[in-house]
């Protein structure tokens, strides 16, 4: 029988890395949007309207992705904490 070994610090570290990636990605998206907003302000007509529609879809999709990643990180963190509590409880039964 193989013994299960859990690296709780590693699990939490992985969740933190995902949170960090979300923050970095959000910052880069904001920076890119600021640059594009400057460019788009000089643009007029139907091309501008089409661009704004695509930009709105991009914004929505990138927000959904970041929310999904935040939820993933939170779920990983909570699962690690639950497993740590479970292991502590089981260990306590045999102490």
UniProtKB/Swiss-Prot annotation:
Gene3D superfamilies xref list: ESAT-6-like
Gene disruption: observed consequences: No secretion of EsxB, very little EsxB protein accumulates intracellularly.
Localization (cell): Secreted
Any single Gene Ontology cellular-component annotation: extracellular region
Main location group: secreted
InterPro entries in the record: ESAT-6-like_sf, T7SS_ESAT-6-like
Keyword line: Secreted
Assembly: Forms a tight 1:1 complex with EsxB. An artificial EsxA-EsxB heterodimer interacts with EspA.
Family: Belongs to the WXG100 family. ESAT-6 subfamily.
Remaining remarks: To improve over-expression in E.coli the proteins were cloned as a single protein in the (non-native) order esxA-esxB with a cleavable thrombin tag.
Function: An exported protein. Unlike its M.tuberculosis counterpart has poor pore forming ability in artificial liposomes, does not undergo conformational change at acidic pH. Mutation of 2 residues to those found in M.tuberculosis (25-TA-26 to IH) alters the properties of this protein so that it inserts into liposomes at acidic pH, forming pores, like its M.tuberculosis counterpart.
Protein name: ESAT-6-like protein EsxA
Organism encoding this protein: Mycolicibacterium smegmatis (strain ATCC 700084 / mc(2)155) (Mycobacterium smegmatis)
């Amino acid at each position: 029988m193989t013994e299960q070994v859990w690296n709780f610090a590693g699990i939490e570290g992985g969740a933190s890395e995902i949170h960090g990636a979300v923050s970095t990605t959000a910052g880069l998206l904001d920076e890119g949007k600021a640059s594009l907003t400057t460019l788009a302000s000089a643009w007029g007509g139907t091309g501008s309207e089409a661009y704004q529609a695509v930009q709105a879809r991009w914004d929505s999709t990138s927000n959904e992705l970041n929310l999904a990643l935040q939820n993933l990180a939170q779920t990983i963190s909570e699962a690690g904490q639950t497993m740590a509590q479970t292991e502590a409880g089981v260990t306590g039964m045999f102490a």
